[in-house]
Amino acid sequence: MGINSIFPRQLEADDIVAYICREHEGTKVIVSVDQDFLQLVSSECTLYDPIRKKFFEDGNFQEQTGYQNVDEWYTAKCLIGDSSDNVPGVRGFGKKTVQKYLKDPGYILSEKEHKIFQRNADIFCLDKYEELPEEKKYYKEQLEVKVDACYKTFLKYCEEYHFKRILDKKEDWHNLFFMKSLYNKLNDITS
């Protein structure tokens, strides 16, 4: 159908997304509400949150998150923790305390605070693929498979399996297939 597919073996999907974003050149747009993907935002990678209809990019990162850059955001996440993932943060660190910490290069975490920070960094970091060279090689090979985008085959498949919602929006799928300004189309949604 013209779409590369990667079948996870040992890694979770978010680690595979991280691999694609960090290891492959070119523009990438992640469409997800998962804020953990903010750590992947770069000059080549944008996160689009379809619920909030917001883009998180290199150029607007501070405006959208309140943090100057990805490193600051990641440091804050490791200190604050994430209640939605059931990961407690360093005691006494909320958004205000984190901002003070980030502005004070002389602040040193206690040994206990540092252990919690490091544990959270290990949990939140999307680079598990680095620990598994065979997996990394496998995903690289999966992405190198050349698939021809065939819109007609895609539509035939959708008709055969009665994918009515896709068929109702053929033009949108056509634009996706041929990458006709996906970024601009998503940007129009947010305006």
Predicted region positions:
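Extended two-metal-dependent nuclease catalytic cores across DNA- and RNA-processing enzymes
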Residues: M1-D168, F177, L182-I189
